[in-house]
Amino acid sequence: MHKVKLAAITCELPARSYENDDPVFAAVPDLSESWWQFWGVNRRGYFDPRNGENEFSLVVRAAERLLRSSDTAPDSVDMLICSASSPIMTDAGDVLPDLRGRLYPRMANVLSKQLGLSRALPLDSQMECASFLLNLRLAASMIRQGKAEKVLVVCSEYISNLLDFTSRTSTLFADGCAVALLTRGDDDSCDLLASAEHSDATFYEVATGRWRLPENPTGEAKPRLYFSLFSDGQNKMASFVPTNVPIAMRRALEKAGLGSDDIDYFVFHQPAPFLVKAWAEGIGARPEQYQLTMGDTGVMISVSIPYTLMTGLREGKIRPGDRIVMAGAATGWGFAAQVWQLGEVLVC
């Protein structure tokens, strides 16, 4: 069985960042200081389609930069795995220039064509906030079995397209995209050591996308697709999300034959400080072994984990030879964790 290397990673965020006091939130009620402190978001970015920003254009920019920086020829990529939580695709680049909003085709086929990945099998997957981990596992499985040597993993989130800017939850989320390259490892210096996932649909309705009116509608408001957080979602999430991610981490570590003391760094999804800290405490991670990134970026759904990973690599908190755990939760609800032995990872 072949080893797997996380070879390169990059992210692309919107050009403009919105502070908590921005007029875009003028119609949102009850934005108290305690709200901001609890959720820990100070600023977040939204794609601006007027300036050509969307879930497709920015991921093309990021993927082209990664391929160029890693000296990877497009026709050498064997597989492309894409995730986008929004069901609405807004752009298809030069491939389908006249196609605008659509439900399908999804991203992988169109992006593969745009990037010139002439040999790549395109695949779309979905696990919301944990999609990056799912995609890494799928890619690693193909490489480990010898069915692929190079796999491009993409997560792109245009969540602002679904936000209800009369609801407090609109202040939490943000747009962004991430691209990673997985390759066959040449030695034992790097590998995906173990993965663990489980799910529980008991609280499926807590966070969903559904057709409805805005929470505080005007006379001209019409139903449309909005991200929707259950009215008591904060308390419901606190009843099961803090404990389930550590369960996934312990299972992954057990599969790898390791304990938490063997891990150098932890990379968590970034939904809220209280959840990240609960996950860290649940696995025995020290404060210096993980970080919070949602303050400057907002909650970028599936992009939060790769962005936090990239930040740790860029800041030197994660180094070649380190063993790391990546973990998070996904609406629905799913819980995932992975243990990686990292080699040199190109950040571009």
Curated annotation (Swiss-Prot):
Outcome after substituting residue 269 to A: Alters binding properties for both 2-ABA and 2-AA. Almost loss of activity
Catalytic EC class: transferase
Subunit structure as annotated in this protein's UniProt entry: Forms a tight complex with PqsB.
Species name: Pseudomonas aeruginosa (strain ATCC 15692 / DSM 22644 / CIP 104116 / JCM 14847 / LMG 12228 / 1C / PRS 101 / PAO1)
Homology family: Belongs to the thiolase-like superfamily. FabH family.
Lineage, highest ranks first: Bacteria, Pseudomonadati, Pseudomonadota, Gammaproteobacteria, Pseudomonadales
GO terms (BP aspect): fatty acid biosynthetic process; secondary metabolite biosynthetic process
Residue ranges of the TM segments: none
Gene Ontology cellular component terms for the protein in this record: cytoplasm
Compartment list: Cytoplasm
EC number: 2.3.1.230
GO molecular function, one term: 3-oxoacyl-[acyl-carrier-protein] synthase activity
Catalytic-site annotation from UniProt: 129 (acyl-thioester intermediate), 269
Reaction(s) this enzyme catalyzes, per UniProt: (2-aminobenzoyl)acetate + octanoyl-CoA + H(+) = 2-heptyl-4(1H)-quinolone + CO2 + CoA + H2O
Keyword RNA-binding in annotation: no
Name listed for the protein in its UniProt record: 2-heptyl-4(1H)-quinolone synthase subunit PqsC
Activity regulation remarks: Folding of PqsC and binding of octanoate are promoted by PqsB. Binding of the octanoyl group probably increases the binding affinity of the complex for 2-ABA. Activity of the complex is inhibited by 2-aminoacetophenone (2-AA).
Keyword tags: Acyltransferase, Cytoplasm, Transferase
